[in-house]
A protein has these predicted regions:
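Terminal recognition/anchoring or ligand-binding modules at protein termini
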Residues: 9-44, 61-141
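A contiguous, well-structured pocket-lining segment that forms one wall/lid of small-molecule binding clefts
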Residues: 53
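Primarily EF-hand calcium-binding motifs
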Residues: 57-59
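Bacterial N-terminal signal peptides
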Residues: 1-7
Length: 141
């Protein structure tokens, strides 16, 4: 799992340290981590750029950059950022609920996986690490 987190090391240490300290990750930080981690955003971009990228696509949450995201919302953003396909229910109704269920089913989200629960910065980074590891092994496509 640490391999996935190491691949995010190009980002500034200060930013990662700030995320790790967050008891509830914000939309802007979540969007930035996911898009930079997926290679869809340059690390020199801002959290506002990352949020705007999601807001112009299918995973728009309509939240402010400083608003916290739930596990379901984070899962939806992750599935969108990494192009992870979902099962029948997610395909029919892509929503935070079904995104969280899909990522729990695929062992990306480990432990409790309630769509409305808070996501700490540490857990957000663990989820990205897991996505990168499973993607590398071809188990998410």
């Amino acid at each position: 799992m640490m391999g996935g987190i190491v691949s995010l090391s190009a980002q500034s240490n200060e930013f990662i340290d700030g995320v790790l300290e967050q008891p509830r990750i914000t939309y802007g930080n979540a969007a930035y981590l996911l898009l930079v981690g997926s290679g869809d955003l340059d690390e020199s971009a801002t959290v506002n750029d990352a949020r705007d990228r999601f807001e112009s696509g299918a995973a728009a949450l309509g939240s402010g950059v400083d608003e916290p995201v739930t596990l379901g919302e984070y899962s939806l953003l992750a599935m969108n950022a990494f192009g992870i396909t979902g099962g029948v229910m997610y395909t029919m109704a892509p929503s935070p609920r079904y995104a969280a269920r899909e990522l729990a089913f695929r062992d990306v989200v480990q432990g409790r996986a309630y769509p409305r629960m808070d996501v700490s910065g540490e857990r957000a980074l663990r989820i990205i690490g897991r996505v990168l590891d499973l993607n590398e092994g071809g188990r998410l496509q």
